[in-house]
């Protein structure tokens, strides 16, 4: 299997020697339930595919582990009782606690999803989700008649901010006068709050909604109100069969499988893995029936440029909310700058809480 990674940080160190697949006992720690229909659902779908691809591999999952110190005893138990030699910690808020536990168990390999801190036996992984986010913005901008587009967002962290920015860049590429209105949830998974935020955006005049949350609640609200919606994580057309336009989606097996192979081979090293559409780690869900052929063609044309490496989303000129140029024409943001993004692009209505 190929190693699907783009690394801007130097490798810290090689892990321990080869670990036979039969003895690896990989564990996956999830922030939500497998049945959330989104983030955790897709991560577990990836796990299942990886298990099927490696004969003898038997994985363990722990669901609904809150971000914060609650993850520590879970990790300890997986190492001591489950004898896990590889652990995937699958949400941003586990970061510092994974590092603390990893210090005590140097012979265990940890991969932290969405984080940026590494150690000799701790790597990080994520996908270039901003790429399909931009493409979904092209769709949303094309389908909005009012130019008022809502975005239900989880937490004000760089992961979410760069997604909103990429989406807004896509929206305004085809609808230059459009505005993307952001509402913060301060939660990854809260169906009630997600639906409430969606209804508030619809009531404010938004005729297309996008989302960065873990369930299908926003899509359900849009279906009920007959407002177009762009999903996230998974193809969410099941929640909005007539109003779902498309969704940026994850193929987590493309991230998990290379790590399993490397640990088995004894070639794993601590690094930042960031795979994109080219590697198949992220993509765009099928278009809904409402999306016209000319919009589909525009999206496919830009998709081809991204996959080929001819062009990427954060290529200038790009201005921020204040109208100041942040990315000059002819230049593209570096990976570290994209990863640490803490400002909104022009055309976004809303603030980033400090």
State where each predicted segment sits.
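Bacterial N-terminal signal peptides
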Residues: 1-12
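A residue-level marker of the well-folded mature domains of exported/periplasmic proteins
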Residues: 16-354
């Amino acid at each position: 299997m190929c190693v699907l990674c783009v690394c801007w940080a130097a490798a810290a160190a090689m892990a321990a020697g080869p670990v036979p697949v039969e003895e690896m006992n990989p564990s996956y720690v999830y922030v939500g339930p497998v049945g959330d229909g989104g983030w955790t659902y897709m991560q577990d779908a990836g796990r299942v595919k990886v298990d099927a691809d490696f004969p003898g591999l038997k994985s363990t999952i722990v669901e609904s582990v809150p971000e914060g110190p609650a993850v520590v005893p879970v990790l300890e138990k997986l190492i001591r009782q489950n004898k896990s030699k590889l652990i995937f910690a699958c949400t941003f808020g586990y970061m510092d606690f994974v590092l603390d536990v990893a210090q005590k168990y140097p012979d265990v390999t940890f991969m932290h999803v969405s984080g940026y801190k590494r150690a000799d036996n701790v790597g990080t992984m994520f996908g270039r989700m901003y790429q399909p986010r931009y493409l979904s913005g092209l769709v949303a901008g094309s389908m909005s008649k009012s130019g008022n587009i809502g975005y239900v967002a989880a937490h004000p962290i760089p992961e979410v901010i760069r997604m909103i920015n990429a989406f807004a860049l896509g929206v305004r590429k085809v609808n230059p006068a459009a505005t993307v209105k952001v509402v913060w949830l301060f939660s990854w998974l809260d169906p009630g709050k997600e639906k409430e935020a969606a209804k508030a955006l619809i009531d404010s005049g938004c005729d297309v909604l996008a989302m960065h949350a873990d369930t299908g609640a926003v899509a359900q609200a849009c279906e009920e109100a007959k407002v177009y919606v762009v999903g996230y994580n998974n193809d969410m057309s099941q929640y909005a069969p007539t109003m779902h336009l498309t969704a940026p989606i994850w193929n987590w097996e493309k991230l998990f499988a290379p790590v399993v192979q490397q640990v088995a081979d004894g070639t794993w090293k601590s690094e930042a893995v960031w795979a994109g559409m080219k590697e198949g780690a992220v993509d765009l869900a099928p278009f809904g029936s409402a999306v016209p052929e000319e919009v589909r063609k525009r999206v496919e044309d830009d998709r081809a440029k991204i996959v080929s490496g001819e062009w990427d989303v954060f290529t200038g000129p790009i201005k921020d909310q204040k109208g100041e140029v942040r990315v000059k024409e002819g230049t593209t943001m570096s990976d570290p700058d994209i990863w640490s993004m803490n400002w909104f692009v022009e055309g976004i209505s809303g603030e980033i809480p400090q």
